Curated annotation (Swiss-Prot):
Note accompanying the cofactor annotation: Binds 1 zinc ion per subunit.
InterPro entries in the cross-refs: Ribosomal_uS14, Ribosomal_uS14_bact, Ribosomal_uS14_CS, Ribosomal_uS14_sf
Subunit structure: Part of the 30S ribosomal subunit. Contacts proteins S3 and S10.
GO annotation terms (biological process): translation
Job description of the protein: Binds 16S rRNA, required for the assembly of 30S particles and may also be responsible for determining the conformation of the 16S rRNA at the A site.
Binding-site list for Zn(2+): 24, 27, 40, 43
Record has Cytoplasm as a keyword: no
Gene: rpsZ
Name of the protein in its database record: Small ribosomal subunit protein uS14
One term under GO cellular component: small ribosomal subunit
């Protein structure tokens, strides 16, 4: 899990626009962020398996 200090630091307004980065809305993870859903890959997988993301289903081909 992300450290609380880093999450709070990222939420404050940044002096320069290039300092902004995306974090997962659930766990605060900065990597493997899925922009369309606003969560990281781990939380996305958990939500998709529970059926909490509408229109998402496991791929099979």
């Amino acid at each position: 899990m992300a450290r609380k200090a880093l999450i709070i630091k990222q939420q404050r307004p940044q002096k320069f626009s290039t300092r902004y980065y995306n974090r997962c809305k659930i766990c605060g993870r900065p990597r493997a962020y899925l922009r369309k859903f606003g969560v990281c890959r781990l939380c996305f997988r958990k939500l998709a398996h529970n059926g909490e993301i509408p229109g998402v289903k496991k791929a099979s081909w």
